[in-house]
Amino acid sequence: MSPTMPTSNTLSARLLDLTSPLQLLLYSLLYLPITILSHPTLLLTNPHKFQSLWFGALWKFLGPQMALSPEQTPYIAGLFNRAQGTVLELGPGNGDQMRHLVNAVREGRVERVVGAEPNAALHERLLGNARGVGLNPGQGKYVVLEAGAEPGSLIPALHRVGMYPSSSSSAGAGAAEGIFDTIICIKSMCSAPQHQMPEIVSTIHALLKPGGEFLFFEHVANDSDLLTRVWAWLLGWIWPIAMGNCHLNGRVDKAVKESGVFESCDVRNTKEFMGWNVFRYVVGVCRK
């Protein structure tokens, strides 16, 4: 057998990888009738809120399990271990990754966390997980914003809680010295509007204090394999609807590299990436 020919193990692994999104879609579709029965008219009267409740119900079940991935945990824990000072987490969901902050909070390295989570259906559990690691919302140690990462959502939300001087959607004036020591996102940038990613990265940079870090663990577009690209494109017709506006063609990695605004930026694939994975995960550490 030629050394360049795929082995049966490789073919099996690739088939499993290609079908893994279908398993997640199945979970999501199981929660669709449950959400319809719970809110029988909402799909017609408020489709956006219905989608949020649908995904919220799914993620309360699926999020904690996915947060325990043995392959991903070392990368994610390593990023949270770098967090310090005042932290902004973009898209914390249920707060399932909050456990990685326990030591930093106890040691005083992390003083306050702001969680920008656009899905209000997840806020109750998010606040509960914050209390569990010693970030008491009642003491101002944890602040939850009903906001996404895009400037038009995030900046006004920060203004409403008194953390940003202007309600303008631009993160320019008034943010020269920054607000946060650390901005972190874990598997959430895929749900942001991908066409706004350059503006999102620019806003993140503006909100960081000098020397602050933007830390991320995200799945992004796989541009290296034609079959995977076609499969991701086909899935893309239903994937965002069923998976909380998640996109398989994420581009945060490209956006930070192309921005040129960070003093240093290290973005690399995880060691598990085989070149053909549908979910291509990258780890990023960018310093202002």
Regions found by a protein language model. Name each.
Residues L88-R160:
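Class I SAM-dependent methyltransferase SAM/SAH-binding core
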Residues L208-F214:
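Short glycine-dipeptide loop
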Residues S191-T203:
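A short, conserved alpha-helix within the catalytic core of class I
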Residues F55, M66, F217-R280:
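C-terminal alpha-helical "lid/dimerization" subdomain adjacent to the S-adenosyl-L-methionine
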Residues Y281-K288:
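C-terminal lobe and adjacent flexible extensions of AdoMet/dcAdoMet transferase-like proteins
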Residues A57, F61-T86, D96-A104:
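Conserved alpha-helix/loop element of class I SAM-dependent methyltransferases that forms part
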Residues I184:
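A conserved beta-strand element that flanks and buttresses the S-adenosyl-L-methionine
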Residues P151-E177:
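Short conserved loop adjoining the S-adenosyl-L-methionine
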